[in-house]
Amino acid sequence: MQNQGNKVLSAAMLDSADRYWLRLCDVWPEAKTALTAMQQQELTAVFGLSDYMGEQLCRHPEWIVQLFDGLLDDVVRSEFDAQLHSLIADLTQEELVKSALRRYRNLQMVRLAWRDFLNYTPVEESLLDLSALAEALVIAGRDWLYQEMCQQYGTPTSAEGNPQPLLILGMGKLGGRELNFSSDIDLIFTFPEHGETVGGRRTQANQQFFIRMGQRLVNLLDQVTVDGFVFRVDMRLRPYGESGPLVVSFSGLEDYYQEQGRDWERYAMVKARVLGPWSGYCDELHDLLRPFVYRRYIDFSAIESLRKMKQLIAQEVRRRQLTDNIKLGAGGIREVEFVVQSFQLIRGGREPALRQQSLFGAIDTLYSLGQLEYLAVDELKHSYIILRRVENLLQAIDDKQTQTLPNNELDWQRLCYPLDMADEVELRQKINQAMVTIHGHFNATVGGTDSHEHNDHWTALFWNVQQDEHANALLQEQQVDDAELWQLLSEWRQTVSKRSIGPRGRETLDKLMPKLLEELVTQTKPSQAFKPVAKVLDKILTRTTYLELLCENPGARQQLVSLCCASPWIARELANFPMLLDELIDPSQLYDITSIDDYPSELRQYLLRVPEDDMEQQMEALRQFKLSQQLKIAAADVTGVLPVMQVSDHLTFLAEAIIEQVVLQAWHQVASRHGIPAETSPSNMGFAVIGYGKLGGIELGYGSDLDLVFLHGHTGSGTTDGKRPIDNGHFYLKLAQRIVHLFATRTTSGELYEVDMRLRPSGASGLLVSEIEHFGAYLQQEAWTWEHQALVRSRFVFGDYSLAGRFSDLRAQVLKIERDKQVLAKAVKDMRIKMREHLLQVEPGQFDLKQSAGGIADIEFIAQYLVLANAHQYHELTIWSDNVRIFEVLAELELLPIMQAQHLTQTYCWLRDENHELTLQQLPGKLPIQSVLQKTDSVIEIYNEILAI
């Protein structure tokens, strides 16, 4: 053991220090003679406390001298900005700027970590120092790029001739000047007015200039080089997230937040602060955002919004099985932020003093306004400071963004040393007490879902009874006429007794089962209700958190029983993916279906909880979002809230939102390796996803696959702009391959969607992505009739909107080709016969909803034939890709008698409705033939009449 003042380094810390001393002496042999005994002792402590500091100081031994020569003195934050601008002012190459910024960042981070670990400064000051450093680095990079780009492209100006700057909103902890050691930084880029550049070799629109500048700035800060990175940059809080432009004007920001701003974006904007020197534009921007964040009235709706956000975080903790998380766990750092920001959102419209980004400042203001008692303020601040100090030290050990307590003894010792704690046990006790205190204040302010004691009545006896006669007597006493329930329950209990679920799990199960039985006996046939519920329980017996969730939430138990009874498909989903149980907690939210237009923004919000660079977690989050939204749709379906047409609408628009994010993720992954083609960006990628089949016809069902075709608009021989450039065609091929991979990879939450690419030109043997002109030529010159039929049910789903228009024109041109009706009718009928021969498998007396004569496929073929036969005369037939609206147009054009159109539409919707219902019951898509003849015989007559040869 070695003393540092009155503190002691453990043996493991000394071993770590010795390793760094050996490395240091290799690169600086005079180290021990150059440093005093006291300096050596302090450096030994630093080496033992932090691998990050050890690595950096061995790489840059000259920093040790600088640090001991005064750099460890109190930080003067204004010096960061001056030093950085001086450091890079004369540099002319971006790579040199990157290196300079990274070296400066690492030196200053070592300095701040040193001061933190050895208690040179309180944590509040440390957070201010880190925030000032980050802000100075961002602004130095921005200013260098602006000057460099103005020389190249001219200065962006407004219509009145005023130079336009790039303003950067710091969000989250950077905005609040409370940045922790290894945090990423959330930024939003904006500029005041549209216009053009002036004085360059060629003019550019201001937005184009700033998007290019923003891309370079993110790269300048975020890219990992031999010197490391400056800060990880997260741009997902901007309007429309990753699918939106990287930079928008003030007016664009204002329009977005007025028309589409979400509650979570209000919450995020509380912390928003313009970085860098203040100007009139900064005042203008804050004035523009204020009405969105702070309402003129006292806004208690903020409480419910924050409560929902907290529930989402709790779900994420459970789903990712996060333990010992001092940020997201109950009583963690996030709950303090929720408490303070709930008051800010509720009362900030009336109390200007609350409109501040700093949590410390806001909480003091709440006391001065009488909104929080002194004891509450004192306890919250004290507990928050403990957690922020632990978080900061935890991250400074190895410059890693983590809020999870250590899983090894050495790192616990490293935390205990600066916090004057004897050991892990004492420090854990201090942390736990802080989190209990915070959680109490959170529940008092924002509210939670803590359970109340439940009166278990007779079901507690029933669950614990050992003998058949006692069990049957209890059932008779309670007038439950279902003897099979006891038989099933006792058999299941015996099976469970052999499972290894641990004492906590068994205790929770014993509390849960009486409560669950109370729900089961309200069903018409409790024993039948128990069977699917038991399958769910089987899957979560070893996941005690989910047993506790059901135990503590009456709404979840009620929904579990009712939904499992209503749909075996839902029961299977809950059993296969227990994280869906979170969706059952609040029935009002379960049946509050996401509106059709909100799926993209809901998914963007959902993905914000996952680190942008964690590909595995991003893939898992996409699957979890799909599963949870699909469950909500199914719950509304089985309870009759949604008719079949709307079920398909919701499933289709959910898929579209997911396609958008998959394409964006694939784009970033391929671009990070190879760069991107010229004149492209995530919002202008020269790439399009075309949906065919049920996706194209807006008719997806549960478990539908996605029929996709990929197009790109780049011709010629250009290459990408990355360090490993490839030709543009190869880039789009890699993009398509990556998209398919992201869909098909099986994670713990399964496959995202099964993707069918066989409708692309030349089918499975063709290229995975087609240049749009080649695609058009193929359709007009080489495609079969069945490919033109498929085109009827196709539409642009996501991508570059310039390609959307080109695809729409191309589709219309092909559909409007004049065809010989006799030849067409024969080709359509032959294809239908071929399909039936390959796909129809029914027992005598059974009707296959899709493939039997008079079924779904016949109705689809009628629509496709009539479009292909008549679109050359009636261009309106090329507008829609769904059968229902095609029949409407056919009736309006008198190409189909209105009675026939109505009958086909009604039968089509009825067959799809039955198919949905059978899917939810986990039954094959077949019915007794007698139950459908009245409807389908008429379809057969219409089919034969229209396709008569």
UniProtKB/Swiss-Prot annotation:
Any Pfam family the entry gives: GlnD_UR_UTase
Region feature (Adenylyl removase): 1-450
NCBIfam families: PRK11072.1
Function: Involved in the regulation of glutamine synthetase GlnA, a key enzyme in the process to assimilate ammonia. When cellular nitrogen levels are high, the C-terminal adenylyl transferase (AT) inactivates GlnA by covalent transfer of an adenylyl group from ATP to specific tyrosine residue of GlnA, thus reducing its activity. Conversely, when nitrogen levels are low, the N-terminal adenylyl removase (AR) activates GlnA by removing the adenylyl group by phosphorolysis, increasing its activity.
GO biological process, one term: regulation of glutamine family amino acid metabolic process
Organism: Shewanella frigidimarina (strain NCIMB 400)
Domain of life: Bacteria
Family, similarity comment: Belongs to the GlnE family.
Residues covered by region (Adenylyl transferase): 455-949
Protein name as annotated: Bifunctional glutamine synthetase adenylyltransferase/adenylyl-removing enzyme
This protein's record includes keyword S-adenosyl-L-methionine: no
HAMAP family: GlnE (MF_00802)
GO cellular component terms listed in the entry, alphabetical order: cytosol
EC number: 2.7.7.89, 2.7.7.42
Catalytic activity: [glutamine synthetase]-O(4)-(5'-adenylyl)-L-tyrosine + phosphate = [glutamine synthetase]-L-tyrosine + ADP; [glutamine synthetase]-L-tyrosine + ATP = [glutamine synthetase]-O(4)-(5'-adenylyl)-L-tyrosine + diphosphate
Cofactor(s) the record lists: Mg(2+)
Example GO molecular function: [glutamate-ammonia-ligase] adenylyltransferase activity
Enzyme class: transferase
Gene this chain is encoded by: glnE
InterPro entries named among the record's database cross-references: GlnE (IPR023057), GlnE_rpt_dom (IPR005190), NT_sf (IPR043519), PII_UdlTrfase/GS_AdlTrfase (IPR013546)
Record keywords: ATP-binding, Magnesium, Multifunctional enzyme, Nucleotide-binding, Nucleotidyltransferase, Transferase
